[in-house]
């Protein structure tokens, strides 16, 4: 008889050491963002300080300063690194296509 026990897959949480400048991260609960077109509200890390992360993304309006938040808040927001999934030099169009 086949074992049909349900096994939950647990997503690995990001750690502070995994955050890298220039990489893009997706939200745990993605939302649409952008001024003229809808994109996923991904964030690209521009700078990492001792306790803060400065980022860019479709939700950051043109000619505005890059927002800075604590590393803990960024990690609470971020689900995973999506840099390799994105078209080169572009943001992910909303809605996100199902794989």
Regions found by a protein language model. Name each.
Residues 16, 21, 45-49, 65-72:
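Generic alpha-helical hydrophobic packing signal
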Residues 4, 59-99:
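Intrinsically disordered, low-complexity, charged/polar segments
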Residues 2-20:
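Mixed-charge, Lys/Arg-rich low-complexity intrinsically disordered regions
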Residues 14-35:
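Short coil-to-beta transition motif at edge beta-strands of beta-rich domains
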Residues 17, 28, 56, 94-97:
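A structural detector for beta-sheet-dominated domains
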Residues 9-13, 41-42, 76-79:
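Short, charged low-complexity linear motifs
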């Amino acid at each position: 008889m086949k074992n049909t026990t349900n096994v939950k897959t647990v997503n690995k949480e990001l750690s502070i050491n995994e955050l890298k400048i220039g990489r893009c991260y997706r939200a745990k609960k993605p939302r649409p963002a952008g001024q003229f077109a809808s994109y996923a509200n991904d964030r690209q890390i521009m700078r990492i300080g001792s306790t803060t992360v400065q980022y860019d993304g479709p939700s950051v309006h043109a000619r505005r300063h890059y927002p800075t938040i604590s590393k803990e808040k960024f990690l609470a927001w971020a689900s995973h690194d999506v840099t390799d999934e994105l078209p080169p030099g572009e943001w992910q169009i909303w809605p996100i296509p199902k794989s």
